[in-house]
Amino acid sequence: MAVLSSADRASNEKKVKSSYFDLPPMEMSVAFPQATPASTFPPCTSDYYHFNDLLTPEEQAIRKKVRECMEKEVAPIMTEYWEKAEFPFHITPKLGAMGVAGGSIKGYGCPGLSITANAIATAEIARVDASCSTFILVHSSLGMLTIALCGSEAQKEKYLPSLAQLNTVACWALTEPDNGSDASGLGTTATKVEGGWKINGQKRWIGNSTFADLLIIFARNTTTNQINGFIVKKDAPGLKATKIPNKIGLRMVQNGDILLQNVFVPDEDRLPGVNSFQDTSKVLAVSRVMVAWQPIGISMGIYDMCHRYLKERKQFGAPLAAFQLNQQKLVQMLGNVQAMFLMGWRLCKLYETGQMTPGQASLGKAWISSKARETASLGRELLGGNGILADFLVAKAFCDLEPIYTYEGTYDINTLVTGREVTGIASFKPATRSRL
């Protein structure tokens, strides 16, 4: 077989390619003027049962502020950065100015929102872009909340004010390569040494980890065998965080692999309130509610996009909205959004009155994320060929829902949490083989 020289290969490629092969893509307004892309975000049309009336004036104001910021600052750029799998760091000050980082934490420069207001803000961010909502959720409802619930007074005063302004960013590292759903079996270790601790181990799928200023690391105390929590600073000797490539969902989120090799953490940065795996549950109880509101917001955005698209796009001489099949799918999506919102709202009220159980939170996250997948699938059908373009939101949202369906407890694990609560029987491990 003859081996072509570089010059010959270049010549052959030139012969194969057309004269217009390397031209840049058309602007969407030129290529497809028949419908408006998501860079100009559609108005909200999904609140069919007027759930906004259930919100307090404060909660309504937060919704309005976040919606305006996301539509103005994020919608025009999100497709570009999603495609590049990069986070738009230049908008971080804008996200900080929304005043939602820190959520329900009171004091220390945090907003002290109600759980409902925090949830509404989460949904409004996710309505436009799921990656931005995950960035905020990891930073606020996991990283900051762990310091607020489990940290010392000195740690709260030192770290929370800067985090609340998004001047610094946090991540939360629990998951490991060998321990996802079985997080309580984590293998990262913390060994007591003079003046502090030596951390060794590996974490995976950690959002914000490649650029976070503070990393909340959970490790097993080699003396007590219990789970402890630590605040690790970026660039600590022995710490390395590298980006996980080739994701198909939440592409703007910088998920990373974290390697810890004899990372020294001073005693002052050990979280005194984390002394067992159960202590992480105080944080996860709140974050799981917030995660349930992400697919609510995503589904709102999908519905809004499809509602506008069906009225703009014409086939057979009429808007797509004029056809019975399309109306049926659109109404099914609308019904899903109403039911999802109502379940999410009730979860918030149960939490605010101290009645919410882990099983209720798990059922909410599992059922809502499942209905969101159905909503995204219907939306993809309604948009036809444009349903596979990130420019029209639905394809992007379709992909972004997949990791959300999995993190903070897979659908199956969350059903087992609820199942344990309603039956009194834990079924996380294989049952003993029957002798029958």
UniProtKB/Swiss-Prot annotation:
Catalytic activity entry: a 2,3-saturated acyl-CoA + O2 = a (2E)-enoyl-CoA + H2O2; butanoyl-CoA + O2 = (2E)-butenoyl-CoA + H2O2; hexanoyl-CoA + O2 = (2E)-hexenoyl-CoA + H2O2
N-acetylalanine PTM sites in chain numbering: 2
Subcellular location: Glyoxysome; Peroxisome
Span of the annotated motif Microbody targeting signal: 434-436
GO biological process: embryo development ending in seed dormancy; fatty acid beta-oxidation; short-chain fatty acid metabolic process
Annotated tissue distribution: Particularly abundant in etiolated cotyledons. Also present in flowers, roots and siliques, but not detected in green cotyledons, rosette leaves and stems.
Cofactor or coenzyme needed: FAD
pH behavior: Optimum pH is 8.5-9.0.
Keywords from the UniProt entry: Acetylation, FAD, Fatty acid metabolism, Flavoprotein, Glyoxysome, Lipid metabolism, Oxidoreductase, Peroxisome
Residues annotated to bind an acyl-CoA: 181-184, 288, 409
Highest taxon listed in the record's lineage: Eukaryota
GO MF, one annotated term: salicylic acid binding
Enzymatic class: oxidoreductase
One GO cellular component, as annotated: cytosol
Residues bound to FAD: 172-175, 181, 207, 313-315, 324, 381, 385, 410-412, 428
EC number(s) per entry: 1.3.3.6
Main location: other
Induction and repression of expression: Induced by dehydration and abscisic acid (ABA).
Family: Belongs to the acyl-CoA dehydrogenase family.
Biological function: Catalyzes the desaturation of short-chain acyl-CoAs to 2-trans-enoyl-CoAs. Active on butyryl-CoA (C4), hexanoyl-CoA (C6), and octanoyl-CoA (C8). Has no activity as acyl-CoA dehydrogenase or on crotonyl-CoA (an unsaturated C4:1 carbocyclic ester) or glutaryl-CoA (a dicarboxylic ester). Peroxisomal fatty acid beta-oxidation is essential for embryo development. Acts as a suppressor of transcriptional silencing. Required for nuclear histone acetylation and DNA demethylation at some endogenous genomic loci.
Subunit composition and interactions: Homotetramer.
Protein name per its UniProtKB record: Acyl-coenzyme A oxidase 4, peroxisomal
UniProt source species: Arabidopsis thaliana
Gene name in the database record: ACX4
